[in-house]
């Protein structure tokens, strides 16, 4: 499983550090993987730098920005390895590098991503970052007669709106009529479902379909100044 997001040297550095932290981890049957326990806080002391992330509902430069791409890529790899997901949280807004309802957000120490090795054999995590691309695999002996695809259905797409915010002509901010003051690009609200679909290796026909997630991403409207004279 591979994902690619917007390029920046500092964000790519964070991807590399995140992948290095989890790469090579081996889980015996019954053991649980915790992203926060293994990666920990993404601090400057560990070499993490700034990258795009969310801060108070807006895209901002944050230390460790991009680490969620590593968690999200690993999440899909785990589902397609048919592993048990123990803990996972969606982003407030649908990330551009993932399909709807297939992402996993990390916010240390509060929001974690965990999965369990519910197989009868050891598994190994492989995670590699190359520039803005992250590739994650779950390695093990595969004796199954089926394969899994993590597939998404968009239920509803609600377009973002233009919201006008009123200011007087002599406003302290110095805003002018028609000025766009939202800090980030607008996002539409998306309601989506994702399924853990099993297919026969022999016939490629669908064997079973299990709902993995049903959720709605927030919208982020475009905010425009409207100058209104109070007199």
Which residues does each predicted region cover?
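Well-ordered beta-sheet/strand-loop patches within structured domains
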Residues: 1-231
């Amino acid at each position: 499983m591979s994902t690619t997001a917007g390029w920046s040297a500092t964000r790519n550095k964070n991807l590399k550090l995140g992948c290095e932290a989890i790469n090579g981890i081996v889980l015996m049957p019954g053991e649980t993987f915790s992203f926060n326990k293994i990666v920990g806080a993404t601090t400057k002391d560990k070499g993490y730098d700034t990258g795009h992330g969310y801060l108070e509902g807006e895209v901002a430069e944050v230390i460790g920005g991009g680490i969620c791409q590593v968690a999200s890529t690993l999440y899909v790899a785990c589902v397609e390895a048919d592993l048990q997901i123990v803990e996972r949280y969606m982003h407030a807004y649908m990330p551009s590098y993932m399909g709807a309802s297939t992402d996993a957000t990390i916010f240390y120490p509060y929001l974690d991503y965990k999965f369990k090795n519910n197989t009868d054999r050891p598994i190994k995590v492989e995670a590699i970052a190359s520039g803005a691309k992250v590739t994650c695999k779950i390695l093990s002996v595969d004796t199954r007669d089926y394969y899994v695809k993590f597939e998404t259905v968009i239920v509803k797409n609600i377009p973002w709106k233009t919201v006008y915010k009123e200011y007087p002509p002599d406003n302290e901010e110095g805003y002018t009529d028609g000025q766009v003051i939202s800090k980030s690009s607008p996002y539409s609200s998306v309601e989506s479902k994702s399924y853990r679909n099993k297919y026969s290796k022999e016939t490629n026909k669908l064997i079973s379909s299990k709902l993995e997630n049903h959720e709605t991403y927030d919208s982020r409207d475009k905010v425009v100044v409207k100058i209104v004279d109070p007199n």
